[in-house]
Amino acid sequence: MINKETIENVKAVQSSYDEAPYKSKTFYYTQPGRQQMVLKLLGFKTPDLENARVLEIGCSFGGNIIPFALENPKADIIGIDLSGVQIDEGNRIIEYLGLENIRLIHQNVLDFDDKLGKFDYIICHGVFSWVNEEVQRGILNVIKNHLTENGSAILSYNTYPGWKNLEVARDVMLFRDEMLKNRGEQINESNAVKYGRGAIEFLSQFSMLNEKIKTGITGITEKDDYYILHEYFEENNQPLYLYNFNKMLLEHGLIHVVDSDLMKTFPNISNEIEEKLTAECGNDNIAKEQYYDFLLDRQFRISIVTHEANKEKINISKDVRITDLKEIDIRGKYEKNKDGFYTIENNEIKDEEVSLILDILSENYPNTITIDELEKKVREKNKLETNNVYANAVYLMYGKLVEAYSRKLTVKKEEKIKLNPKYKKYLDYFITNPNPVIALASYEGTINYDTINPIMLSIMTLFDGTRTDEDIFNFLVEKEKAGEVVITFEEGSSKEEVIKNNIEICRNFIEINFLNK
């Protein structure tokens, strides 16, 4: 039986998201492919993606799962959300795209329909910290009872200690709104953020708070209004310490395995600190991660979760086994500076082997290459029997310097490239909707394109399998001459150069994101 307070709380949340919806994006670190890759790296095999059953709790308009549905037509995807407004619009988008393997349901997670069955991958992003404890436990019950034996789930949530700094910003915004209400001002969702921004801008400029807190407050002012409204003005915002979060999981027969952002579980810290933590925590990975959060002031986590019974099957360790590394696929594209060195995070790469790895990845891009294949290529080129390819690959993955996948991805090279019809419909949605409610996403959501150039998208739709790049160039030149297309260009360039450059960009986008598969 749902208690009365929770019913009222749920109604408030539903009303908030109906009245002030926000753009639904694709979050890379929540994707089933990311979950599978991370767990594969740790020696644990999750179900195949192609035929997976996927559930998203709090799916909004479906922007996080629609790309997965497009990529995996044999998969079965379901999203649930409290907001009927967002569910209805999301289903209209799905119908427009012609997708039959995904549906969105207007449903409270506390009333979850058991007939929906079991799921191989469950996503719950941007929900857990923003509901009360009864709903949190309801979410965990759904995961426990509806996750397949070797399945995995994603739960994201705000964390302490980092959020203690941000609570100052939340408190001052809520304080100002309450003060103005008491003076007779009409405060509602349409103006609450405006007044809140004023309060934190004042703090940012004049406060005696320490610089770290002031920096965090200043960062809030750069966020969109809808983000600030739901992040800082919701009735519920309950950050958690990781160890308390894991206690809740254990009560439901679940465990935190690692953070989907591996650097949060295996940070790059000094050997001295690592040795002290190992002496303190032993094999208790949760305790060690909690210390990392204290040391690094973490404010947000994306936990990969599975059944507690699976713990012994997973190598939860910074020391990844070579057998697990071999079949991970990676890709990346890198540029050298004027001195002939690769530059990563403003550091010149002078290590010969790392430079060779970046050479090979760049030559192979946008195709992926397994780390086993990479190691063999390095041996062939440097003529040495021993190398550090596996260690360097881990460094690149943990540092988010390569894209990593659980399956091989190969670009289909064609002179007359053909955009897959399902992706043409996807692009058409953004071309015909000046204010789309979902974000255009790259493959697996590594990038969300908030600013969309409809002309560029229209050029992409010209790759229909009947035209070469030159044919498209000639077509656009004629359209420009007829006044049907407007080409803007800077001084020193020509319309023809701009058109050719745009065609190349569009071809690369299609190939890099496998839109012609």
Where are these regions (language model features)?
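Conserved alpha-helix/loop element of class I SAM-dependent methyltransferases that forms part
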Residues: E19, F27-A52
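Conserved SAM-binding loop of SAM-dependent methyltransferases across substrates and taxa
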Residues: F61-K74
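Conserved SAM/SAH-binding beta-strand->alpha-helix loop
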Residues: S83
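Conserved SAM-binding strand-loop segment of SAM-dependent methyltransferases
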Residues: G98-V109
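A short acidic, Gly/Pro-enriched loop at the edge of an enzyme's catalytic core
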Residues: D114-Y121
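A short glycine-rich, Lys/Arg-flanked "PGG" loop and its adjoining helix->strand segment in the class I
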Residues: R137-E149
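Conserved class I S-adenosyl-L-methionine
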Residues: L155-R183, G196-Q205
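Long, charge-rich, low-complexity alpha-helical segments
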Residues: P267-N310, T343-K517
